[in-house]
């Protein structure tokens, strides 16, 4: 007789090979036919709301790994909340305006953008942005991200622009917006102001100079000193700013020394605390401090500029420190915020001797027309020749660069629009207290950034952006922004989009009969030519998209990368507080690290170390990318490399093989009729469910804490340690050899069903494709929605199946004995004493505290140890002896037993197998 036919051999049709790159697109088509997103909302309608507001990626390129990590985490969160009974609307968005798209389209099309009409240029930018929205959307859909992809928000859409105009109007009306001439970050290459969030710092080589400013005054306070020999020594790392010098700042409370170097007929004034350091840099080993005075003593004295025919006033400022330099601070109000405020306090006129392109103006004399970087060596040489250079050094310092063109920027005073953050800073800081921060230090980071920030420069000298909705009266010249003008422009943009601003005259946009609210004249009006900072666009999304189109505010959660503390998190907070007069627009704020290569380096094209999500989809499948995101501690930088994905493939296969084992052995099992009650289950099976309960609790806690890597690692450990290495090995004999519908087999199948059902639900937020594939292949209870695992809640622990703690302690001891037995069996195999473990008989000695093992049924214990025979005695310590089993090998189950052949008519079978075969009435 061919006994193989009598075995319950695993069969389910669930493939061992995943074939994800081919199988996943089929699943995407299934989800599309199912209308997964909308069906999910219908299923959970009326349940508690969880709203994750999408931070809009920039629509200027294909997906990169940073996009993939961010969207994967968002999908994990939304799916996990949906499967815990929440209503989870999710509207994806895109940030469309700004310099990155202008730069990209100019580079791509080699356009002379200045020769193009504004309308044509903006149309080209719009088409470019739309193209990459489609590219990115397809990539996110390929990842399996569940969202309303047919109705995303775009910051360039007319409706959004109209609502953003109203946000600007609210902030203006609240008195927080003004126009002023003050220093801002300026990119000479792109000829526009920049926000702090658009600045990147790089280490650059630099020549730092110590410069002598000769005393100009008649020395009424110092009559005993020779004016012609006396100079103040300043220090700067930006030589090109020296033509803009108007003052030298001293700390009023610090002591300043008049210093005479040995062998030189000159006198230098510098901070006494820095004298030794500065004189050393100047090459003077020997010097004399002639006298000292407090900084306040020199206030309003005049020094001569070292190479221009003008003077420099001595002023006082508390920000002058003794950390570096000379204590005499070069002050150019056109190039620094502190400089500007100090000179403003002393009533000095603003001087900006550099134009939009970073070239010196006529004010700089012989350097007029030179770019700032070109003038540095020329000015340096001129100072050397004139004898005004005290010393110079070559250093490397951290210098700001434009985030888009990567070129050095300058600090330059220009007329700009600002949001006065100072006027509502305290409210913004207080709003941070009501937010759950993940990680917790996020609160202090954002609070400190808001506390330290200056006013927000919100104007840009660009054409691809939302126009600043302000008019100017031609008669009085004052800016105009009222409820009436805001309503008119918002209504116009709603109908025609913001291109109307560039295509229509001011009078045609304003209400008929409109007059200037300042002077009452109707002589004519002009439009503002600047556009709004892109951070104002994205900072308005919580109002312009979430509240006005979705109907709820604030969002439950914001989640973005670490850089968004100074970007989107901050701009959203400032708009919410400054414009709307509310608190933070999010209840929870979560951040993740950067994506880096396997060595921890940033990924750059020049290094060739980047990874393309599309290539990962094609090589490994989207579920492997999701597993990468779900297995990484995203609070720090997340590494990705081909080696990492190969390792993840092994972890993935462990889970897939676990699911396959369950599915293969659940063929013919109906949970509606075949589930075994806890009291009727074998204790081993209840042990497995009790271990599952521990996993469920850990997974729930991990999802609550957004620790997705803990979810993945816990499930992987459960599959490897509890199931594959222990439980599955033991129950194979029961599953394959016991009667198909026997109580013992149904007991094991009950445990397998509960395990598979719970694990599939728990892992579904992360392994979306694979868990859906499992769900569609597995048996279900009538209460389940078999269409998608996402339509079902995660299970709670099966408390009714749980073993008491003392029983679990016994099983821990059994597992320890099994480990010892396995070691002894390995040695016996190596010694050729036995072949397979079922050929063995083991003698086990256990210490007194484990005496319960001696009382266990010998056959049951042999099954647990996967040997044919076992004897247990109580002694001093745990020992194991292995010998060949006594008896004959059963032709069906392969156990070696003395009872084989004792059933009449079944000479080669053990009694258990004989009974099963007899019941099947199988004839060869």
What do the predicted segments below correspond to?
Residues 95, 184, 188, 194-202, ...:
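Acidic, turn-prone loop/beta-hairpin segments
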Residues 187, 402, 473, 516-519, ...:
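Short cysteine-rich clusters marking metal-coordination/redox-active sites
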Residues 247, 254-328, 337-341:
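Protease-associated
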């Amino acid at each position: 007789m061919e006994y193989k036919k009598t075995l319950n051999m695993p069969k389910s049709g669930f493939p061992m090979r995943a074939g994800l790159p081919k199988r996943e697109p089929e699943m995407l088509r299934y989800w599309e036919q199912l209308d997964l997103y909308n069906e999910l909302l219908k299923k959970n309608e009326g349940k508690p709301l969880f709203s994750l507001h999408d931070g809009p990626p920039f629509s200027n390129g294909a997906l990169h790994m940073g996009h993939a990590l961010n969207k994967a985490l968002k999908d994990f969160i939304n799916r996990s909340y949906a499967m815990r009974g929440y209503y989870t609307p999710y509207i994806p968005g895109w940030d469309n305006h700004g310099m990155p798209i202008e730069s990209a389209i100019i580079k791509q099309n080699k356009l002379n953008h200045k020769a193009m009409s504004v309308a044509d240029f903006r149309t080209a930018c719009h088409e470019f942005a739309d193209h990459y929205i489609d590219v990115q959307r397809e990539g996110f859909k390929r990842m399996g991200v569940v969202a309303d992809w047919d109705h995303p928000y775009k910051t360039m859409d007319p409706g959004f622009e109209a609502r953003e105009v109203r946000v600007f109007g609210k902030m203006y009306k609240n008195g927080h917006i003004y126009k002023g001439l003050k220093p801002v970050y300026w990119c000479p290459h792109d000829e526009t102001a920049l926000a702090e969030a658009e600045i990147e710092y790089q280490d650059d080589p630099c020549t730092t100079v110590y410069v002598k400013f000769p005393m100009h005054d008649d020395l009424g306070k110092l009559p005993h000193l020779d004016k012609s020999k006396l100079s103040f020594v300043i220090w700067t790392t930006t030589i090109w700013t020296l033509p803009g010098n108007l003052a030298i700042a001293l700390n009023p409370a610090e002591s300043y020394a008049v210093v005479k170097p040995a062998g030189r007929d000159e006198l230098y004034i510098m901070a006494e605390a820095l004298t030794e350091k500065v004189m050393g840099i100047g090459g003077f080993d020997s010097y004399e401090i002639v006298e000292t005075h407090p900084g306040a003593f020199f206030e309003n004295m005049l020094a001569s500029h070292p190479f221009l025919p003008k003077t420099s006033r001595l002023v006082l400022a508390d920000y002058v420190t003794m950390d570096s330099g000379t204590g005499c601070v070069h002050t150019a109000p056109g190039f620094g915020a502190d400089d500007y405020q100090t000179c403003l306090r002393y009533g000095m006129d603003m001087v900006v001797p550099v134009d939009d392109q970073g070239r010196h103006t006529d004010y700089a004399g012989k350097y007029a027309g030179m770019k700032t970087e070109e003038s540095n060596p020329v000015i340096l040489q001129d100072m050397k020749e004139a004898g005004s250079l005290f010393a110079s050094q070559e250093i490397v310092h951290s210098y700001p660069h434009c985030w888009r063109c990567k070129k050095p920027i300058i600090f330059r005073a220009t007329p700009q629009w600002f949001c006065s953050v100072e006027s509502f800073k305290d409210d913004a800081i207080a709003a941070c207290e009501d937010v759950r921060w993940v990680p917790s230090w996020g609160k202090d980071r954002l609070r400190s950034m808001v506390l330290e920030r200056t006013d927000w420069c919100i104007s840009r000298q660009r054409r691809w952006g939302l126009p600043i909705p302000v008019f100017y009266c031609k008669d009085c010249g004052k800016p105009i922004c009222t409820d009436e003008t805001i309503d008119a422009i918002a209504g116009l943009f709603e109908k025609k989009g913001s291109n109307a601003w560039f295509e229509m005259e001011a009078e045609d946009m304003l209400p008929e009969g409109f007059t200037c609210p300042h002077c009452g004249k109707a002589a004519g009006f002009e439009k503002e030519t600047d556009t709004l900072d892109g951070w104002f666009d994205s900072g308005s999304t919580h109002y312009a998209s979430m509240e006005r189109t979705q109907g709820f505010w604030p969002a439950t959660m914001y989640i973005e990368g670490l850089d968004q503390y100074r970007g989107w998190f901050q701009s959203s907070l400032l708009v919410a507080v400054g414009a709307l007069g509310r608190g933070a627009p999010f209840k929870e704020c979560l951040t993740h690290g950067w994506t880096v290569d396997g060595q921890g380096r940033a990924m750059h094209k020049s290094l060739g170390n980047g990874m393309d999500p599309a290539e990962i989809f094609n090589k490994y499948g989207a579920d492997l990318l999701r597993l990468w995101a779900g297995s990484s501690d995203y609070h720090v930088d997340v590494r990705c490399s081909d080696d990492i994905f190969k390792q993840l493939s092994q972890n993935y296969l462990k889970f897939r093989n676990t699911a396959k084992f369950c599915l293969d052995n659940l063929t013919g099992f109906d949970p509606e009729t075949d589930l075994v009650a806890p009291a009727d289950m074998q204790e081993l099976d209840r042990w497995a469910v009790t271990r599952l309960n521990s996993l469920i609790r850990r997974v729930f806690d991990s999802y609550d804490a957004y620790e997705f890597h803990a979810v993945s690692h816990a499930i992987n450990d459960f599959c490897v340690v509890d199931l594959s290495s222990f439980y599955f090995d033991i129950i194979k004999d029961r599953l394959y050899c016991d009667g198909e519908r026997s109580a013992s087999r149904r007991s094991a199948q009950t445990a397998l069903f509960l395990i598979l059902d719970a694990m599939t639900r728990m892992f579904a937020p992360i392994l979306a494709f694979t868990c859906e594939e499992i769900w569609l292949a597995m048996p279900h209870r009538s209460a389940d929605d078999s269409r998608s695992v996402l339509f079902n809640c995660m299970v709670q622990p099966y408390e009714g199946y749980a073993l008491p703690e003392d029983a679990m302690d016994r099983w821990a001891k059994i597992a320890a004995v099994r480990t010892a037995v396995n070691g002894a069996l390995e040695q016996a195999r190596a010694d050729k004493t036995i072949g397979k473990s079922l050929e063995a008989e083991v003698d086990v000695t256990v210490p007194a505290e484990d005496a319960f093992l001696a009382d266990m049924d010998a056959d049951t214990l042999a099954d647990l140890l996967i040997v044919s025979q076992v004897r247990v005695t109580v002694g001093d310590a745990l020992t194991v002896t292995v010998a060949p089993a006594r008896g004959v090998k059963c032709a069906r189950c392969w156990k070696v037993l003395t009872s084989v052949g004792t059933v009449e008519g079944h000479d080669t079978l053990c009694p258990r197998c004989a009974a099963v075969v007899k019941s099947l009435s199988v004839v060869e």
